[in-house]
Swiss-Prot record:
Enzyme class, first EC level, given as a word: ligase
Keyword Transcription regulation attributed: no
Organism: Clostridium botulinum (strain Okra / Type B1)
An example Gene Ontology molecular-function term: ATP binding
EC number(s) from the headed UniProt entry: 6.1.1.1
Gene field: tyrS
Protein name listed in UniProt: Tyrosine--tRNA ligase
Length: 407
């Protein structure tokens, strides 16, 4: 068994560890069970989760067993981490639906067959907890003074932190304890914003079970300016093809800044590090070849080789003028009766933008093009004159294209 710790370290995933030497030794000697938590607040994972999926896959390839914990119980409270407002509570039915969607997406790069990975829902043990017993067994081990120093709570104290949310750390710590008892799970992994919650679980297991437990956080996927990657004009970059088409997904990675290519190749592809270094060393116009490889590899992981190939062909057709391949571009279909309406209305109706206000915002910023002409008029009406042989071409920014076909 290769030591996955060295792989994770070389590729730059690791941010913080509870016990560095012990963790390296453990991962090299034994096959362990570890877990990562997923908050089921949407019916699709997004690029922010993709990094966690990659870490799970690297660990599994090295012989360790991933446990994907879906927060069906904690999701009914909401995690205050990184939030300035309290989250909306969800129904059991919404959470269950989202859990099923997550498993399908995780299965793209994680093998759930023959117990090689499992998915569990913390609603199974949290929803039937006896409050008095929970306070006596778990609450007694948590210091309020210490909890208040955690970053996730500090930012909320000024605005007001409900007791409901204050319980989140206890529940996440209890999750780790339950997984340790049921599945001999000895390590929790998560984004660096989860550090305080992970420490709470590690400490709880050591106190309750007198056993060793470990925690590891990894870097968040940020660009060279320190901003989280995976945001587009239309919102989050989703892994669900119905929310973000494979073409849009491909184009996002094809258009990353030169300074971000090396980091993305390391963190979100399985390319060997020698190949990552070779591609990252390309300069000038040649860096575009590295971006094409990045876009293809990431799209292939999430949407499969066939969709990645289609997206690649569509992108090349657009810049090479090969109209017959434009069918792979995100395309919306409208009726002739939909013409003679405001462009912003049409864009919202075709779901090219989540709302009219988003479309107006981009027009104001000078980033929206209709048939390659910049749109400056908020009240532009789309008529038959705008319909070309290939349809109506919409461009957002420099390289994000959509097509509207009139039937």
């Amino acid at each position: 068994m290769s030591n996955v710790y060295d792989i994770l370290k070389e590729r730059g995933y690791i941010k913080q560890l509870t016990h560095e030497e012990e963790i390296r030794e453990l991962l090299g000697k034994e096959k362990i069970s570890f877990y990562i938590g997923f908050d089921p607040t949407a019916d699709s994972l997004h690029v922010g989760h993709f990094l966690q999926m990659m870490v799970m896959a690297h660990m599994q390839k090295a012989g360790h067993r991933p446990i994907a914990l879906v927060g069906g119980g904690t999701g009914m409270i909401g995690d205050p981490t990184g939030k300035t407002d309290m989250r909306k509570m969800m129904t059991k039915e919404q959470i269950e639906h989202n859990c099923n969607c997550f498993k399908k997406q995780l299965a793209k790069i994680i093998d759930f067959s023959e117990d090689k990975a499992i998915m569990v829902n913390n609603a199974d043990w949290l929803l039937n907890l006896n409050y008095i017993e929970f306070l006596r067994e778990i609450g007694v081990h948590f210091s309020v003074n210490k909890m208040l120093t955690a970053e996730c709570f500090k930012s909320r104290l000024e605005k007001g932190l409900s007791f409901l949310e204050f319980n989140y750390m206890l529940m996440q710590g209890y999750d780790f304890l339950e997984l340790n008892r049921k599945y001999n799970c000895v390590m929790e992994l998560g984004g660096d914003d989860q550090w305080s919650n992970i420490l709470a679980g590690v400490d709880l297991i050591r106190r309750k079970e007198s056993k060793s437990a470990y925690g590891m956080t990894f870097t968040l996927l940020t660009n060279s300016e320190g901003k989280k990657m995976g945001k587009t004009e239309s919102g989050a970059l989703w892994l669900d093809p119905e929310k973000t088409s494979p073409y849009e997904f491909y184009q996002y990675w094809r258009n990353v800044a030169d300074a971000d290519v090396e980091k993305c190749l390391r963190l979100i592809t399985f390319l060997p590090m020698d190949e990552v270094r070779r591609l990252s060393s390309l300069e000038g116009a040649e860096i575009n070849e590295a971006k094409k490889v990045l876009a293809f590899e990431v799209t292939k992981l999430i949407h499969g080789e066939e969709e990645a190939q289609k997206a690649k062909i569509a992108a090349e057709a657009l810049f090479g003028g090969n109209a017959k391949d434009l069918g792979n571009m995100p395309t919306a279909y409208i009726d002739k009766n939909d013409l003679n309406n405001l462009l912003v209305d049409l864009l919202a109706k075709c779901e090219i933008f989540p709302s009219k206000s988003e479309a107006r915002r981009l027009i104001k910023q000078g980033g929206l093009y209709l048939n390659d002409e910049k749109v400056t008029d908020m009240n532009l009406v789309v008529t038959e004159e705008h319909v070309t042989e290939d349809g109506i071409m919409i461009r957002r920014g420099k390289k994000n294209f959509n097509r509207i076909v009139v039937e």
